[in-house]
């Protein structure tokens, strides 16, 4: 049996007690994003997903694409967002959603360590196929960052998404 990380253990315990989880998404780098995270944490969020701004967020819809562009236009970068996230200290798990180009460009180990140093518990990399996630997942695991994989409800059982990741597994609808 694989080891459950703190993020997954926390979320499972809450779900197992019959609770629904509230995990809002906030695009890092937008005006007031840090205050939005603090407010969500203070008002019962179980965790928060921080979107790292990216120039071509093809896996996102138009609202998140626009938010990412606005953050970039304001000067945000993954590094500035993670630096700010490291100072949040909100008492709930933080995860990031980022594109594989960001991970690859920094290097798996370096990026995973940067997330860990910023207090990030998990990472969603939606454009990283499960079959190619091994090097990233190994580096993330070594840094104590849980890899959160996404799956469509129609994904075949043989993809075994739940067996090949740590963190929570998101099912898209």
What is each residue range found by the language model?
Residues 62-114, 118-120:
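Glycine/small-residue-rich loop that forms an oxyanion/phosphate-binding "nest" at active or ligand-binding sites
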Residues 165-173:
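Active-site rim beta-loop-alpha module in soluble metabolic enzymes
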Residues 1-23, 84-85, 89:
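N-terminal amphipathic alpha-helix/helix-capping segment at the start of soluble metabolic enzymes
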Residues 46-78, 130-133:
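Glycine-rich, proline-tolerant flexible connector loops at the mouths of alpha/beta enzymes
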Residues 72-76, 96-98, 119-132, 145-160, ...:
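Catalytic beta/alpha-barrel core
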Residues 31-43, 155-165:
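Catalytic cores of alpha/beta
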Residues 20-35, 93-107, 148-155:
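Active-site mouth loops of central-metabolism enzymes
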Residues 24, 40, 48-51, 115, ...:
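Conserved, mostly hydrophobic/aromatic
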